[in-house]
Amino acid sequence: MSYENLANLIFPNIDKTPEYYFEKYPKRDLKEGAKVLRYAPSPTGFQHIGGVFASLINERLAHQSGGIFYLRIEDTDQKREVEGAIDDTIKTMHNFGMDFDEGITGENSEKGAYAPYKQSQRADIYRAFVKDLLRKGLAYPCFMTSEELEALREKQIAEKLTPGCYGEFAKYRDLSPEEAIKRIEAGENYVIRMKSPGNPEKRVVAHDMIKGEVSFPENLQDVVIIKGDGLPTYHFAHAIDDTLMRTTHVIRGEEWLSSLPIHLQMFEVLGVEAPKYAHIPTIMKMDGSSKRKLSKRKDPESAVSYYSEKGYPSQSVIEYLLNIINSAFEEWRAENPDADYHDYKVELDKMSKSGALFDLVKLNDVSKDVICKMKPEVVYDLYTNWAKEYDKEMYDLVTSKEAMMKEVFNIDKEGPKPRKDFAKWDEVREKIFYFFDELFDKETANDVELPKTLELEEAKRIIEAYEKAYNFNTDKDTWFSDLKEVAVELGYATDRKKYKKNPEEYKGMVSDVAGAVRAALTHRANTPDLYTIMQIMGEEAVRERFKKFLAL
């Protein structure tokens, strides 16, 4: 009865057993092959792109299998908790199209039959399992002080031994329950450690769903499972929570791979089946000619807020991350340009085993493709939602001309090679400013981008001539014929072959004349279709722009 007495002394108010909790949280009634996965952040800061990356993998694997994706908050380190971090997590994942089937729904709310989903509210559950281990002699109170532990560590390092509390160095491992009871009753501080059954001669071999077979020496450490403050360590809480919440697969960063022997051993000691594990590669970026880990401190793109501020549509970020998760996604997208990305099946065994390279240039390419396929009404809604928060002037201007802006967002969208003007919403202002006199009139002659073959005075001569010939009420072919007539009158070639054969006979090409008109109306050399721009602006605005150009 000594172990029983020790367990009751440490946890006098814990009357539930592991069997009670196994019955309370039964196996989930899901179809065969359905996976149960979780996103389990600590509320110690705001979300970063690595969290979205990990969450996306978990969400896709769960939902594409007809399973469950839940949110658990691992808040045992409450000293580091940041106010608002939980709501930020929920909002971020929702904005990226990932909603949780169960778990935490707000700072003080949750849903699901496996509650509570906050570790800080599960203390009695952990204590029930620790009490059971104490009863069975599989765990023990350790009274080593921090000074003793530090001295032990220094001694072990000096002797080139593995530092830690194990074997002969586990001072209180074999302490009798009676002696432990005396020390506790005397008021000594302690933690609770699990007795490791590890053998230094053996290795643990496991299957990682990304890396394949992995092998490590068995864990020898008597790891702490309950800290001095009575809360569990991450290792122990993880094992209990994933067991009771019936998690089938744990997808986490490869920095946790070295902890796998500890976690597998815990499941063994607890007498329960371990979930399957996959350790995803760290997100890297190029720094000169070498790769390094994406840094919260150095790289603004590591923060999720960066993508909101710049105006990347959430779908663009998701599609780019799917490219990182499975390189085959790019080929699938090319073959299925209009399919929903949810139709793509993520496969862990096809994921890169080395660091996932994050490339903003590639993200921009993906985002241009995503925006290009959007209906103008969708572009308008997404852009104005962004501008309302990040560019109030543009929000006021664009919403004051909603119908016109939907036409603008549809320019050159419906042909076989649609334009890809925007990768993110903060680029829109520069690409459409000329539709608004309030912005256009701030420009000076120095801002005008003329064709390289033209000086400003020659461009003005072109506009003087074209203004007289300009007819708003024509179709595109007639409009271009009129433009060519003006070009011929002014000495510009309309036939490229003739121009190349005798360039000295011409001032330039008809494209230079069109370039002058484009510059007068937009001040830019590269814009969407000029005829369409003029039709959207309207005759009065076009003629007014010609006057302004001639006055430069």
Curated annotation (Swiss-Prot):
UniProt motif ('HIGH' region) ranges: 41-51
Gene Ontology BP annotations: glutamyl-tRNA aminoacylation
EC number of this enzyme: 6.1.1.17
Location(s) in or outside the cell: Cytoplasm
Ranges spanned by the short sequence motif 'KMSKS' region, renumbered to the chain: 293-297
Function of the protein: Catalyzes the attachment of glutamate to tRNA(Glu) in a two-step reaction: glutamate is first activated by ATP to form Glu-AMP and then transferred to the acceptor end of tRNA(Glu).
Family: Belongs to the class-I aminoacyl-tRNA synthetase family. Glutamate--tRNA ligase type 1 subfamily.
Quaternary structure and partners: Monomer.
The protein, known as: Glutamate--tRNA ligase
Organism listed in the record: Clostridium perfringens (strain SM101 / Type A)
Upper lineage: Bacteria, Bacillati, Bacillota, Clostridia, Eubacteriales
